């Protein structure tokens, strides 16, 4: 028997798993959230209805990340979002960089590859939070800069 509390698991070919990850409606399964998790989420929503501090801090961190990426010549898509897509433009290198960031630098980021994005637009999608420190962001950007050179990726010329 399998005992589960929350989450799910899929098996299949790489193509099938990639399709499900890319096009399923958010990995929604029938498992309900535990009451403590639901209560915590409700408390967070109530707090954020009255507080602008977290949003302002996140905007500051996003601006800082973009500035540091620019200073290192690491290409990223400009958008009004809190999501900072760092452009790799190569599916194999995108996965390799994601793996190296996790294994060697303890930084988790999901590679975004085809079919989620068109071929040739592969990217790493970063979302700085209000709780990330400037040191965290510096560590990320310095790690990326090292890998950028190691993987022979092109830089943006200022």
Language-model segment annotations:
Residues 7-55:
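Conserved core segment of the aminotransferase class I/II
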Residues 13-17, 91, 131-133:
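Short, glycine-/Ser/Thr-/acidic-enriched flexible segments
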Residues 19-20, 97, 136, 140:
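Hydrophobic side chains in well-ordered alpha-helices
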Residues 1-3:
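Short, small-residue-biased leader/transition segments that mark boundaries at the very start
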Residues 103, 116-158:
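PLP-dependent enzyme catalytic core of the Aspartate aminotransferase-like
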Residues 55-66, 70-106, 114-116, 121, ...:
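Conserved PLP-binding catalytic core of the aspartate aminotransferase-like
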Residues 5-7, 31, 86, 111-113, ...:
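Thr-Gly-centered strand-to-loop micro-motif
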Residues 20, 24, 28, 45-52, ...:
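Structural signal for hydrophobic packing residues in well-ordered secondary-structure cores
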